[in-house]
């Protein structure tokens, strides 16, 4: 019985750092994702990344781009509005860009 108690205590001691490190891992993952987006040519001022619990994922104009903390939190990408971002050109039915009218 003492052996099983010792094993349980050891498992709890080893698991605790992983649970405590979860918020730090979210920050690290968020930073990695942000750097990838910036490396793809998106200005840092034109998006935000936020870490939210799974039950708060349904936010307008946001999309999930990552997860962390043993999949208990999601990382959301939201495009911010800035005057220098142009809207994509609409195309006509034949696939050619539409002419302004």
Curated annotation (Swiss-Prot):
Signal peptide interval: 1-21
Alphabetized UniProt keyword annotations: Signal
Compositional bias ranges of the Polar residues kind: 79-94
A UniProt-annotated Pfam family: DUF1161
Domain of life: Bacteria
UniProt-annotated stretches for the region Disordered: 79-101
Name under which the protein is recorded: Uncharacterized protein YnfD
Annotated source species: Escherichia coli (strain K12)
Gene from which the chain derives: ynfD
